[in-house]
């Protein structure tokens, strides 16, 4: 009986000694997945030193045939690496982490933000009750409960429940007709 207990303990110790459970900080080294599955490679210093892990599968919020959540970090970004069933040959990347000062703006608990490397930004702002899509070079679309505003340089189109306004009211299109230059000329709809 003692040899059975010893044998079981020895196998258990060996299993624990060669298993890696939990999350480990990694740094992305390659995102050019030859299988096109959103896998990446990373260094995981706490486990592998400076050696890269194998191709890590994504732990995506959802994925299926031809649909899902697709966002890959760039090379040099911080990622969390796990190992399926604790095995080093089955890496998984399950998210990212920011170093000090790397978090994108805006920084609020009520604002959800997706920012690309080139600054293209999607903002869900519960604080201001608006949704905003901003191109990295400046043009933007802003939506609230009562209006949609498209801005590109000095040009602006504002759509409300009652009218469409171009360039801060220089042209207005509404149910009653069209007005130009703040009322200088009006084309109405016959009564």
Label each residue range with its predicted role:
Residues 43-49, 53, 76-80:
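Catalytic cores of peptidoglycan-degrading enzymes
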Residues 35-43:
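Short aromatic-glycine-enriched beta-strand elements
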Residues 49-70:
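Beta-strand/loop nucleic-acid-binding surfaces
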Residues 18-22, 70-73:
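Conserved structured core elements
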Residues 1-13, 70-79, 83-191:
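Right-handed beta-helix
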Residues 20-34:
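Structural detector for short beta-strands of small beta-barrel domains
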């Amino acid at each position: 009986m003692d040899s059975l207990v010893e044998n079981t303990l020895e196998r258990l110790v060996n299993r624990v000694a060669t298993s890696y459970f939990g999350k480990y900080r990694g740094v992305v080294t390659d995102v050019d997945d030859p299988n096109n599955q959103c896998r990446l490679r990373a260094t995981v210093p706490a486990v592998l030193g400076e050696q890269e892990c194998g191709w890590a599968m994504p732990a995506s919020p959802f994925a299926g045939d031809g649909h899902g959540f697709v966002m890959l970090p760039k090379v040099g970004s911080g990622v969390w690496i796990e190992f399926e069933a604790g095995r080093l040959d089955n890496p998984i990347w399950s998210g990212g982490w920011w170093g000090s000062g790397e978090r994108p703006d805006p920084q609020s608990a009520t604002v959800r933000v997706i920012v690309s490397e080139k600054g293209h930004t999607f903002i869900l702002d519960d604080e201001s009750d608006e949704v905003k899509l901003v191109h990295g070079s400046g043009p933007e679309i802003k939506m609230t409960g009562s209006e949609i505003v498209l801005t590109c340089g000095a040009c602006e189109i504002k759509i409300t429940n009652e009218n469409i306004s171009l360039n801060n009211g220089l042209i207005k299109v509404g149910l009653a007709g069209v007005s130009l230059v703040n009322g200088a000329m009006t084309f109405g709809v016959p009564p």
